[in-house]
Amino acid sequence: MPSHVEKAPEMSENNAWRSVHGLLGADTAARVAFLGVPLGRESITRGRCDLAPATLRAALKRMSVYDLETGTDLSNLAVFDAGEVGVAALTPAEAFAPIRDAARTQTQTRALTILAGGNNAITRPGVHALGLRKAGLITLDAHFDLRDTDGGLNNGNPIQALLEDGLEGAAVSQIGLAPFANTRKAHGKARRAGITVHTLADCATNGFVVLVESELERLSGFCEAIYVDFDIDVIDRAQMPAAPGARPGGIAVRDFLAAARVAGAHPKVKCVDLAEFDPGRDVGEIGALTAARWFAEVLAGFAARQ
């Protein structure tokens, strides 16, 4: 008889590929949830943000669960697939309650809920899902999103609407605000409300990821839960053609992805969203693959919590 136990042959690399898409499933005990929010109506720049959740899902099949840079392996991380909220045909006002309720269902039972928009109007109901009295909000965005609401809700006024709803300005931090992309009026509103403002110049001086880390710590000092809005128009337009509002001189995509991992790792971050990805404007799948990588980075950050 042989004196040793023979090892089972390793699975061929041709059959061993496991994608991030394969992490999505029906495990009700999963600590992370994924919810698609295909809201596209009332976008200031018309487009097809409603296509983004499905495009992101498809692109996840091209993301491996293994990060060779850090040795992180997501193979054992289950993500509950909460499907999509049926809001593609609705206005932001009509979609508010369905999005809030669907997000709340997940945030009440999960450590982290990932919302895939959709335009930036998804952020208001997402924050409401956590509760205005206990939530802090970080927006990674080229714009204040403080347009007046007298003409109705759109993707240019979710922060204004939240302030009117009762969210304290001191609980809001906005990082990545771009020059010549905002108004004096909006800047004044932010100052009067007590919002913490970090421009692109501040990001260049202090470091985008460093500012995200510092604002997470600041808000965690007095907020029970933190919501992080990732508007992809904060990325430099040369690296993100699929964002209608992106401008030259924005954040490097590498820093955007690093911030996703930082947010995913913070224990008080209970909900994140990805907004303003428009597949109809994508070039060479740059936006789709960036969105998928963002999702993987959020999960990698979350894995570090455990």
What spans do the regions from the language model cover?
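Conserved alpha-helical scaffold segments that buttress catalytic/binding sites
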Residues: 2-306
